[in-house]
UniProtKB/Swiss-Prot annotation:
Gene Ontology annotations for the cellular component aspect, listed alphabetically: plasma membrane
Native organism: Homo sapiens
Key words, A-Z: Cell membrane, Disulfide bond, G-protein coupled receptor, Glycoprotein, Membrane, Olfaction, Receptor, Sensory transduction, Transducer, Transmembrane, Transmembrane helix
Lineage: Eukaryota, Metazoa, Chordata, Craniata, Vertebrata
Keyword Membrane: yes
Cell compartment(s), UniProt: Cell membrane
PROSITE patterns assigned: G_PROTEIN_RECEP_F1_1 (PS00237), G_PROTEIN_RECEP_F1_2 (PS50262)
Gene from which the chain derives: OR52E5
Name by which UniProt lists this protein: Olfactory receptor 52E5
């Protein structure tokens, strides 16, 4: 039952209603979400394929890009298919375990993305401020250690949020006025008080990531403007263009969503929901487009693969050779 007066720690189901106030246009809302999902799916799969098959792209920067693409695939797949089920087929009912799993996956993916963007900022800092030692600093061993640190840090900060929800008793209405199982939407259905400490921790972690990225770019700008040759400055800054665009695509929707939730009390509720969707739906698609367009190595390899002449002259022995070299 979705409506009950009994207090339960683990109710059987919740009802995710979609975008409150826009139920009549759910079918039409689903089409841009579907297009965004296809873009995210195809774009990130292509990026992973290109990085895996092209030996010239086996560099730290592209390893981090592969991590980002994998994270984007997880985030978009954890959210958009269920949204489309709600928009097109009214499949809003979701089991408690599935709802918790979706919430946990969203937290994991957004946490991973934030850390990967932070590490990528450090990568750009080393590449521009200390280029001669770049390959000596970011060795394969260091990249592997950074990958482990990224995963461990995300798990350490995200897992407590899930245990907090599991400890809360739920009573009354089981309706979530959202398009996915959002943490605060679930917490508001609880009969117990919400511990704000976890929210402060999440905000602090995000602030630390942004601060590290900001410090990296301050140092990058200082190094660039100290270059003796004027024509070298735009070239140096262009290597950071993709990362800056991806960073803005990730953090700006989150900032707008937070600001409207905190201060926009007179803003219609459906605006809050749509902004929250921007935060989890659009970055995975935008990231693949941004890196595909602005990163020369990725763009050239994608065009070569999509070129019919290159396709018919595609030599599978080259991929086998690349894999043999790595082994």
């Amino acid at each position: 039952m979705l409506h009950t007066n009994n207090t339960q720690f683990h109710p059987s189901t919740f009802l995710v209603v979609g975008v409150p106030g826009l139920e009549d246009v759910h079918v039409w809302i689903g089409f841009p979400f579907f297009a965004v999902y296809l873009t995210a799916l195809l774009g990130n799969i292509i990026i992973l394929f290109v990085i895996q098959t092209e030996q010239s792209l086996h560099q730290p920067m592209f390893y981090f890009l592969a991590m980002l693409a994998g994270t984007d695939l997880g985030l978009s797949t954890a959210t958009i298919p269920k949204m489309l089920g709600i928009f097109w087929f009214n499949l809003g009912e979701i089991a408690f375990g599935a709802c918790i799993t979706q919430m946990y996956t969203i937290h994991i993916c957004t946490g991973l993305e934030s850390v990967v963007l932070t590490v990528t900022g450090i990568d750009r800092y080393i590449a521009i401020c200390n280029p001669l030692r770049y390959s000596m600093i970011l060795t394969n061993k260091v990249i592997a250690i950074l990958g482990i640190v990224i995963i461990v840090r995300t798990l350490v900060f995200v897992t407590p949020f899930t245990f907090l929800i599991l400890r809360l008793p739920f009573c009354g209405v089981r309706i979530i006025p959202h398009t996915y199982c959002e943490h605060m939407g679930l917490a508001k259905l609880a009969c117990a008080s919400i511990n704000v400490i976890y929210g402060l921790i999440a905000f602090s972690v995000g602030y630390i990531d942004i601060s590290v990225i900001g410090f990296s770019y301050v140092q990058i700008l200082r190094a660039v403007f100290h270059l003796p040759a004027w024509d070298a400055r735009p070239k140096a800054l262009s290597t950071c263009g993709s990362h800056v665009c991806v960073m803005l695509a990730f953090y700006l929707p989150a900032l707008f969503s937070f600001m409207t939730h905190r201060f926009g009390h007179n803003i219609p509720h459906y605006i809050h929901i749509l902004l929250a969707n921007l935060y989890v739906v659009f970055p995975p698609a935008l990231n693949s487009v941004i890196y595909g367009v602005k990163t020369k190595q990725i763009r050239e390899q994608v065009l070569r693969i999509l070129n019919p002449k290159s396709f018919w002259h595609f030599d599978p022995k080259r991929i086998f050779h690349n894999n043999s070299v790595r082994q």
